[in-house]
UniProtKB/Swiss-Prot annotation:
Catalytic activity: S-ubiquitinyl-[E2 ubiquitin-conjugating enzyme]-L-cysteine + [acceptor protein]-L-lysine = [E2 ubiquitin-conjugating enzyme]-L-cysteine + N(6)-ubiquitinyl-[acceptor protein]-L-lysine
Protein name per Swiss-Prot or TrEMBL: Probable E3 ubiquitin-protein ligase BAH1-like 2
Gene source species: Oryza sativa subsp. japonica
CDD domains per UniProt: RING-HC_BAH1-like, SPX_BAH1-like
Residue ranges of domain SPX in the record: 1-149
Length: 321
C-alpha cells in the first residue's frame, strides 16, 4: 500500500478527527503543476523550470502546508501535555484530574492514548517530508528542503517537539510498572539503547519509519541530567543550559535574554520556553541507577556552590561593595 493511502486510512480510522496534512489535495496541486511544466518544456520555453511562473510556487502549496503543520503540532503538543500532566500529577491534584478526565480511568488507556499520539506525530512528520520531496522532484529545486529548515526555525517540525520525547519516556516508565505488565505489548518498538554508554531513545513505526533521539548533552558530552528541551528541540542538562544562557540556577531559564542562542543550531530566543523533561528524567534514573546516584551527589554540590555565589553577589550589590 502506498504511503498516501496508508496515511488516509490511518487518519480516517482515528477515534476523533484531528488536524492533518492534506496529502491528496497537495498531490493534485503538484500534478497540475507538473502538467504546466511539461507543456512549457514541450513549447521550448525556459519558464517551465522557473518557480516565479508556477501557480503552485507563488501562494498555494507552501502557505497551505504551513497552516496544516502548525495545526498538527499545536494539537499534538496540547494533547501530549495534558496526558503527561495527568500521569505526573500527585495528591489531590491527581485525584481531581482523574475524576474530571473522561475515558482515561486506567493505565492501559493512558498508554494507548500516548501510543496513538506518537503514531499521529510520526506519520504526519513523514507525510510532510514525502510531499516536500515530491515538490523538489517535480520542480528540480531545493525549495522543499528550504521549507523544512524554515519549519524547524518556526517550531512546527513535530519530530523536534519535546513532548514527543516525553511521550516515549512515558511509555517505558509505565511499562516498567509491575501492575502494567499486561500493557507492555502495546508499544514494544520503543526502547532506550546504550551504545558505548551513549543513550538513545529509538522508536519504530509503520515498517520503515524510525525516530532516534540522542540523550547525550552536547555541552558536557555526558548523559543528560535533569534534562530540558529548548524551543528548537535540542536537549541539554539543566545546569548546562543555564550556563549556555548565562543565567543563574536561581533565576532560571525564563530569565534568559532573547538574544541567547542554542549552542547547537545557534537559534536565538529558545531558552525562556524550555520544557523540563520529567518523564525522561525518571526513565534515565531507573535505567542507570549507579550513574544517576553519582550525578545527584555531584549536582547537589555544584548547585549549592552556584546558589551561594549568586546570593553572595546579591548581598555585595545591595551593600554597594
Amino acid at each position: 500500500m502506498k504511503f498516501a493511502k496508508k496515511y488516509e486510512k490511518y487518519m480516517k480510522g482515528m477515534d476523533e478527527e484531528l488536524p492533518g496534512v492534506g496529502l491528496k489535495r497537495l498531490k493534485k496541486l503538484l500534478k497540475k503543476c507538473r502538467s504546466d511544466l511539461q507543456s512549457h518544456e514541450n513549447d521550448g520555453s525556459s519558464a517551465g523550470r522557473c518557480p516565479g511562473h508556477c501557480s503552485v510556487c507563488d501562494g498555494s502549496f507552501f502557505p497551505s502546508l504551513l497552516n496544516e503543520m502548525s495545526a498538527v503540532i499545536g494539537c499534538f503538543n496540547e494533547k501530549a501535555k495534558k496526558l503527561l500532566e495527568l500521569h505526573l500529577a500527585s495528591g489531590f491534584k491527581k485525584y481531581t484530574m482523574w475524576f474530571t478526565s473522561k475515558g482515561h480511568k486506567s493505565h492501559g488507556a493512558l498508554i494507548q492514548q500516548g501510543k496513538d499520539l506518537v503514531t499521529y506525530a510520526i506519520i504526519n512528520a513523514v507525510a510532510m517530508r514525502k510531499i516536500l520531496k515530491k515538490y523538489d522532484k517535480i520542480h528540480y529545486s531545493k525549495q522543499g528542503q528550504e521549507f523544512k529548515a524554515q519549519a524547524q526555525s518556526l517550531h512546527i517540525e513535530i519530530l523536534q517537539s519535546p513532548w514527543l520525547c516525553e511521550l516515549m519516556a512515558f511509555y517505558m516508565n509505565l511499562r516498567r510498572s509491575k501492575k502494567n505488565n499486561g500493557a507492555m505489548e502495546l508499544f514494544g518498538d520503543c526502547s532506550l539503547v546504550f551504545d558505548d554508554d551513549k543513550p538513545t531513545i529509538s522508536c519504530n513505526l509503520f515498517d520503515s519509519m524510525r525516530v532516534d533521539i540522542s540523550l547525550t548533552c552536547s555541552i558536557c558530552l555526558d548523559t543528560v541530567f535533569d534534562p530540558v528541551a529548548l524551543s528548537c528541540g535540542h536537549i541539554y542538562c539543566y545546569l548546562c543550559s543555564c550556563s549556555a544562557a548565562s543565567v543563574t540556577i536561581v533565576d532560571g531559564l525564563k530569565s534568559a535574554e532573547r538574544k541567547s542562542k542554542c549552542p547547537l543550531c545557534r537559534q536565538a530566543g529558545v531558552f525562556p520556553n524550555a520544557v523540563h523533561l520529567d518523564e525522561l528524567n525518571m526513565l534515565l534514573s531507573y535505567s542507570c541507577p549507579e550513574y544517576w546516584e553519582k550525578r545527584i551527589q555531584m549536582e547537589r554540590v555544584e548547585r549549592v556552590r552556584l546558589a551561594k555565589e549568586h546570593w553572595e553577589s546579591q548581598c555585595r550589590a545591595f551593600l554597594g561593595m
